[in-house]
Amino acid sequence: EEELDNRDGFRWSPDGKNIAYWQSDTRNVGTFYMINNVDSNYSRPIPLPYPKVGTANSSVKVGVIPAAGGKTKWFNVPGDPRNNYIARMDYIPGSDEVMIQQLNRLQNTNTVWVGNSKTMALKNILTDKDEAFLDIHDNIEWLDHATAFTWTSEKDGWLRLYKVSRDGKTMQLITRGNFDVVN
């Protein structure tokens, strides 16, 4: 999804034995034409599936496949995949767990899931909301041997840094004051 600045579609597990990846189904998504006018004397249209406002989005899901080959197992992330984006996904260091950020189509709710790549069980550990808009969270740093991670949120009007336990049960404010944290 280019609007979410995703430039690749896979993540290696920490032990190198599995690959988690996005699968995007663009059926029913309208065609947008870009013009290629740089590689020859005559321009040509390049068809791309691209949703416009109010039209069908691509349906995206996350799967895990053994690096040696085999059958893909799929996470069953709740919600209509055409009305939610899988905005970010990465393995948690030293584990078989994948952290998935699911952004709703209005882009004002970011639901964070931790999925076990062996059992495919999902657990919601964090939900960040804003009345208007949320930026994608790209600042995750794993702390304390991957028992906690950093999270930024504007939930009180300022962009603040938090330390969140891996299970999402505790969220500790790190930065205080009337200023935004900048990365």
Question: Model regions: which residues?
Answer:
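Predominantly five- to eight-bladed beta-propeller fold
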Residues: 1-11, 18-75
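Beta-strand C-termini and the immediately following turn/loop, strongest in propeller blades
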Residues: 9-11, 20-26, 52-56, 90-93, ...
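Long hydrophobic segments that form regular secondary structure
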Residues: 67, 71-104
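Beta-rich, blade/repeat-based domains predominating
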Residues: 62, 87-91, 139-141
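Beta-propeller blade signature
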Residues: 60-67, 112-120, 163-167
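Beta-propeller fold detector
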Residues: 73-76, 122-127, 171-176
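Short glycine-/Asp-/Thr-/Trp-enriched loop segments that recur within the blades
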Residues: 1-7, 80-86, 130-137, 178-183
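Short catalytic/ligand-binding loop motif for oxyanion handling, primarily in non-cytosolic enzymes
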Residues: 27-31, 83, 160
